[in-house]
From Swiss-Prot:
GO biological process: cellular response to unfolded protein; defense response
Cellular compartments annotated: Membrane
Any coiled-coil regions, as ranges: none
Organism, scientific name: Arabidopsis thaliana (Mouse-ear cress)
Protein name as annotated: Protein LIFEGUARD 1
Known function: (Microbial infection) Facilitates the development of the powdery mildew fungus E.cruciferarum.
Record keywords, A-Z: Membrane, Plant defense, Transmembrane, Transmembrane helix
Expression sites by tissue: Expressed at very low in leaves.
GO cellular component: membrane
Family: Belongs to the BI1 family.
Disruption phenotype: Delayed development of the powdery mildew fungus E.cruciferarum. Increased cell death upon A.alternata f.sp. lycopersici (AAL) toxin treatment.
Gene name of the encoded protein: LFG1
Domain of life according to the entry: Eukaryota
InterPro entries: Bax_inhibitor_1-related (IPR006214)
Amino acid sequence: MAKSDIETGGGNELYPGMKESSELRWAFIRKLYSILSLQLLVTVGVSAVVYFVRPIPEFITETHRGLAVFFVILLLPLLLLWPLLAFEKKHPINCIVLSIFTLSISFSVGICCSLSQGRIVLEAAILTAVMVFGLTIYTFWAVKRGHDFSFLGPFLFGALLIILVFTLLQIFHPLGKLSSMIFSGIASIVFCGYIIFDTNQLIKKLNYDEYITAAIRLYLDVMNLFLSLLGIISN
């Protein structure tokens, strides 16, 4: 039985007019999704530990030291973005920094999960998995037929800025349940758009040595989509 393109490295073009080697592009895609899968497994593991070991969220949410630790962990991914980009092509430093980045995000996600019921977290996780899988398959299918989603970039970036501003405003002026649910719904649509956009970029635009950048982008897309869906279901 003949193997599929994904298994063999791809004999067919990923998109019309493809001039590069499809085998090299498929190798890049496999490497990227292997890294992303490891990141997601680490996130599930760390989040599960934080969720089920109740002294951890209690320390974070009920003590001043815990809040300070959580604030540092929230800032850590932002601080790590520079070394991630600076050492992107320097192995194994890039993998070490990426691991720390993933662990810090995972801990933050675990704290967010600990504030919700287990059933709600599970529903959000299942919805996220279904949407990510569906959007990824759709993007590969659409790109194969000549569609290009690069035009989404400016619109998604503008929407992301609005989301960041609203998130900061909620710190000082918390939204009601209905407003918070609407906000989470809009955010989930934006991050669905980002999954399509970033998948399009990894198929057509990114260089073969930019797998760290691609992994970070897709990982953040998935995590933000999960947190947005968690916000919808929680409300």
